[in-house]
Amino acid sequence: MEEIAKRIKPVCAGRPEQKTLKAMAPVLKNPILAPDEERIIYEVCRGASLPEDKDIIKDNNIRYDITKIHPGRLGPSTALGVNKELPKTFGHYHIPKEATEIFKVISGRAMFLIQKYEDNPEIIKEVYLIEAGENEKIIVPPGFGITSVNPEKTELILANWIGREVKNDYQFYEKLRGACYYLTENKKGEIVFEKNHNYKKVPTLVKL
């Protein structure tokens, strides 16, 4: 399946979705400071498959998606313009919450920020950072939301498997202006983890 992720025009079940900087504004640390609002940050091909794999995918009731996160920082994270936010996906939980998602890095290097709440989405109980390189896989356990981040200066291509009936739930990421941490880069090129103060409680980030 990985070969279709590297094609210029992979076979999608529908039209590829594109997220511009303007569309990402609800989850950026400082959206009003971000220039070039029509720039495409990432694009998703949902339900991708090769013709010979369609029956297998259908019989197992699963879906294969491809996500490309383009390089390029998203603008300063503060008015002082010291740190710049890293390119990322919007972030989502799953409906139903019991769903499990598997990601594989096709090319590039990824940082996955996964977080979990119990009753109140403003109170995060667990948050982890998982780094993965080419050909490495991660599993998003039930109940966790995920944001995928591209820390490099090159394109990041991800593939994921998810149940066909599972829906992405974006509402709490939008309401709380992103994940519970923002990943930014300082002038030295170091990655900085800034807490999102729209959450009532954020635990210490655990790096796996």
Feature map (PLM): residue ranges:
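Active-site region of the double-stranded beta-helix
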Residues: 1-132, 150-208
